[in-house]
């Protein structure tokens, strides 16, 4: 038989391994429990933060876990206002609606590397904090377009209308001050008008087209040349791909410029944008347009098919040549 000292050492190692295994299982179980409750924990932290009743240590812990916006970076604060439910729609309990909104927002903003936790504040009000975590940061116009998309999804699937109140990005510690102003803005919406509303309408900076050719398509669509827009857009995508210029960033720029061009074409009318992307199939095209060249082409085909063709293809080509000159 082995000496007692060896048996003792082996036994001690075995006990240590068993204890380590138990500790690992406990940590795994704790991690799983936290993940299941992460949304609720973050929501509680948001409510406390906006009402200035938060514990700074708890906030820093959640920031370290990457589920709460960092205090040393700017972000956007959005008040989501549930306006009306359709007469035949089931009214969602606020916590379940918060889960649904979190899922929709995460799917919408994750492709832009935007953290987007949402917390229910009362039966009709929800707070969303947005902050870029990597890559190119979305501007206010981009944020507002994505909020319109969420509004369309809610109208289609949750069967309720919404209003969104926000302002330009600001340091996270200043968000409680802005929250009070957004609540006042919500209270002023006594007609329950849906849409995306800024706290103060500052003079808009002109959109800088990163794909300059797209800027001319606004005139083509307005004058009744959607077929020319489609042909030019398809050709441009193919040429950029052939030259090796097409990647995730350049496709995102193409998508954003194209959507901005559409926004200009309808005169900035949120109602017309809503009508254009109301159907589920259209919403999918809108959401997936920046994921691949094929998806972008499908979006272009849908948008241009929604405009009435007033001119012949030859006339469209002639005008396009003039615009290029």
PLM segments and residue spans:
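Interdomain helical linkers/hinges and coiled-coil/dimerization scaffolds
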Residues: 3-142, 169-175, 179-187, 194-219, ...
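A generic secondary-structure signal
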Residues: 107-108, 153, 235, 239
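A short glycine-rich, hydrophobically flanked beta-strand micro-motif that places a catalytic Asp/Glu
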Residues: 162-168
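Cytosolic nucleotide-binding catalytic cores of signal-transduction proteins
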Residues: 113-116, 120-126, 139, 155, ...
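Generic solvent-exposed, charged/amphipathic alpha-helical segments
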Residues: 12, 102-106, 147-155, 183, ...
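Conserved NTP-handling cores and scaffolds of large molecular machines
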Residues: 15-18, 22, 109-112, 154, ...
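GGDEF/GGEEF active-site signature
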Residues: 134-158
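Alpha-helical bundle regulatory/interaction domains
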Residues: 202-324
């Amino acid at each position: 038989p082995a000496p007692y000292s060896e048996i003792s050492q082996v036994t001690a190692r075995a006990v240590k391994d068993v204890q380590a295994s138990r500790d690992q299982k406990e940590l795994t179980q704790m991690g799983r429990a936290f993940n299941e409750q992460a949304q609720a924990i973050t929501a509680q932290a948001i409510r406390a933060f906006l009402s200035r009743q938060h514990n700074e240590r708890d906030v820093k812990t959640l920031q370290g876990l990457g589920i709460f916006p960092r205090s040393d970076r700017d972000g956007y604060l959005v008040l989501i206002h549930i306006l009306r439910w359709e007469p035949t729609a089931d009214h969602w309990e606020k916590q379940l609606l918060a889960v649904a909104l979190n899922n929709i927002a995460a799917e919408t903003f994750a492709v832009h590397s935007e953290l987007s936790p949402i917390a229910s504040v009362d039966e009709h009000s929800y707070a969303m904090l947005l902050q870029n975590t990597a890559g190119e940061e979305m501007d206010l116009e981009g944020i507002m377009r994505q909020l319109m998309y969420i509004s369309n999804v809610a109208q289609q699937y949750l069967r309720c209308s919404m209003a969104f109140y926000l302002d330009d990005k600001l340091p996270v510690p200043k968000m409680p001050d802005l929250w009070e102003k957004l609540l006042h803005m919500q209270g002023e919406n006594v007609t329950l008008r849906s849409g995306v509303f800024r706290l103060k309408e500052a003079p808009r900076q002109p959109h800088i087209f990163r794909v300059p050719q797209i800027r001319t398509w606004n005139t083509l669509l307005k004058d009744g040349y959607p077929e020319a827009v489609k042909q030019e857009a398809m050709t441009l995508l193919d040429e950029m791909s052939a030259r090796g210029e097409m990647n995730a960033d350049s496709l995102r720029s193409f998508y954003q410029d194209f959507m901005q061009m559409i926004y200009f074409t309808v005169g900035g009318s949120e109602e017309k944008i809503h009508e254009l992307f109301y159907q589920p199939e259209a919403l999918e095209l809108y959401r997936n347009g920046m994921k691949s060249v094929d998806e972008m082409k499908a979006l272009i085909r849908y948008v241009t098919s929604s405009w009435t063709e007033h001119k012949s293809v030859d006339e469209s080509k002639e005008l396009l040549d003039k615009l290029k000159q």
